[in-house]
Amino acid sequence: HSYAAVMVKVNLSDINVPELIADIWSPLNDEQREFLANHFTLQNYKKNEVIHCEGETPTHLMCLLSGKVKIYKDGVGGRSQIIRMIKPVEYFGYRPYFAKTDYVTAASAFEPSLVCQIPMTALMTLLTQNNDLAMFFIKQLSVDLGIADERTVNLTQKHIRGRLAESLLFLKESYGLEEDGSTLSIYLSREDLANLSNMTTSNAIRTLSQFATERLITIDGRKIKIIDEEKLKKISKIG
């Protein structure tokens, strides 16, 4: 079954897609795997390249294999709100298809990213044949809804300090730390950090400086080192 180990040449390095998308590959039988292997495509996105726009009709399930993706919505006065950040290996772009609506958000590559795309029609074929696969997506949607609920509360009820502390912890959770064990593995502009925390850029800059003065973090350009995680958790908690 050579198709079971679909190897794809990307940038001269072999990428074992089935291994990366094990969550949806494992539940499938050989026939279903062959079907999926014949239907997925790989797409490279450059930094800041748009993957889908607000108002578009969803056609594909996206799976981020490498890189980082931001899901955002352009708000009032040209201010954009980052709804969530996608890390490998995570699935996105399929919720509106199930809801029979267009995209209410946009997605763009935060850095060079590799995305595996599966037509929703092909996914629907597999879902009707495979209960375990269907359960996986029910679970995914449930987890995402839980995270969204929590974020709604955080962004609406917490004060500025609490929101920014929350965002820094959220980025650590999502992307981890560099080898030094304290620098966030994602370098956000002040504007992106503000958009993630639902505040103005000037408030984000001011609050970051406060955190640095209080020795909770150190800042070097876009690099943020977390010095006192416990204190950040406390600030995030009391809001």
Model-flagged regions — what are they?
Residues L61, M85, A109, Q117, ...:
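Short aromatic/basic micro-patch
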